[in-house]
Amino acid sequence: MLDSALRQSLETAWEQTLRQLGDETVLRFTHNSIPFAAYIPERVARQTQMQDIAHLDSPFYHSALQIAIPTIKQIRYLWDALGYNAAAIEDDAQLLKPSIQGDSEILTVPGVFAQQADRIIVGEGTQIAPCVVLDARKGAIIIGRNVEIQPHVSIVGPCFIDDDVLIKAGTRMYEGTSLGIASKVAGEIKNTIFQGFGNKQHDGCLGYSFIGEWVNLGAGTDVSDLKNNYSTIRVRFSHDKAREISTGKTSLGLLAGDHTKSAINTSFNTGTVTGVSANVFDRAPDKYVSSFSWGGQPDSPFFEEEKAIELARTVMSRRKRELLAEEELLLRNEYKRSTKNDE
């Protein structure tokens, strides 16, 4: 909690900045109504010399970080995040490298093949087995703390691997991939974002996909990310095919909501969307799978609400996590929305 003097200093600084910038539009970021950052367009910065804003010379602001943003990247849909992910990893590597006290010596262990090791960041407690290739020639590789990388793994940057991740033997990970905290992966993965606690521990191809938290992809689950005719991929967020929208992309795989699960040998079509807590066991599911679907087709029944909540608790407890009351409320609200829309 900020004391009143500090809060007043922040408010005063913001008011002074606005007065000196005049009527130009700037973007303020706040937490509990307290400003902690501001985005000032480049043209405004050129017109108003930032060093001329007197109060910024105060020692109070010397620890502030000024970041030049050449362009604004707008993320309207999840596939936009996939398009920016590789560049974002590179940016993160530049910011993280000076501050991380990692374990670079592990890259010199016999049997670990690191290409352009100066672009690889390894956190403390991470274990890398023999016969692992870390190829950072195309981009940085960021590996968090207490990660386990088993033998015969190949990782091509730019890639991000969060803390406590398990990468199983024989995994092939390609550029633009991010693995969230405590995820467990195997098989082939490219240009994919895993949120935390994802589970893909068996062979299967996954590319150009966004995978929510607590998702489990069964053995042999494969995802198509390119149409046979190489045309632009269209997606929909309901069963109404007339409401499909164009992604403008020729490569897009699976967009999977939290707690979604697929059975063994499931094959997802190009640009498939699944809602929250969907259970997909039809080997060729529809391109849109409702939240809490029990099967994966438009006419599939819904998973029972109480069983879905209890399953979420069970899955999370296996990773020593608890389903918060707020999370349970979100799941119940989504259940009401989904079942109502299907009536």
Residue positions per predicted region:
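A broadly conserved detector of short glycine/acidic/proline-rich loop/turn motifs that flank catalytic sites
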Residues: 6, 33, 41-42, 79, ...
